[in-house]
Amino acid sequence: MRANVLKRKLSLRIKRKKRIRAKISGTQALPRISVFKSNRTLYIQAIDDVKAVTLAAVDGRKIGVKANKEGAKKIAAEFAKALKAKNIEEAVFDRNGYLYHGVIAVLAEALRENGIKL
């Protein structure tokens, strides 16, 4: 892809991210689940925006999974265990400007299947 196309895609994602973040916020009881997707792996974390603290986080590199749908299911299962250990059953899903499609959608569905209410 040409550089200007990539810059445009990134700027559109940043715009979506800002629009989403203006509307949602996490607390201790209802944390914000933020997702970051790179070409190689996924990162997911639960954030309390009031105290600006990360409550739980899972790094796909440490689990040894890739940024694909199967990896998203494994990361979601690990993350759900971490949340349940901290007695968190409900959260707000922040897709971080990514389209709710593919890996991001599978990740959200897998969290729901593992008992986290989004």
UniProtKB/Swiss-Prot annotation:
PANTHER family: 39S RIBOSOMAL PROTEIN L18, MITOCHONDRIAL, LARGE RIBOSOMAL SUBUNIT PROTEIN UL18M. InterPro entries: Ribosomal_uL18_bac-type, Ribosomal_uL18_bac/euk. It comes from Campylobacter lari (strain RM2100 / D67 / ATCC BAA-1060). NCBIfam families: L18_bact. CDD domains: Ribosomal_L18_L5e. GO terms for cellular component: cytosolic large ribosomal subunit. One of its GO terms (biological process) is translation. Part of the 50S ribosomal subunit; part of the 5S rRNA/L5/L18/L25 subcomplex. Contacts the 5S and 23S rRNAs. The lineage of its organism: Bacteria, Pseudomonadati, Campylobacterota, Epsilonproteobacteria, Campylobacterales. One of its GO terms (molecular function) is 5S rRNA binding. Keywords: Ribonucleoprotein, Ribosomal protein, RNA-binding, rRNA-binding. This is Large ribosomal subunit protein uL18. Belongs to the universal ribosomal protein uL18 family. This is one of the proteins that bind and probably mediate the attachment of the 5S RNA into the large ribosomal subunit, where it forms part of the central protuberance.
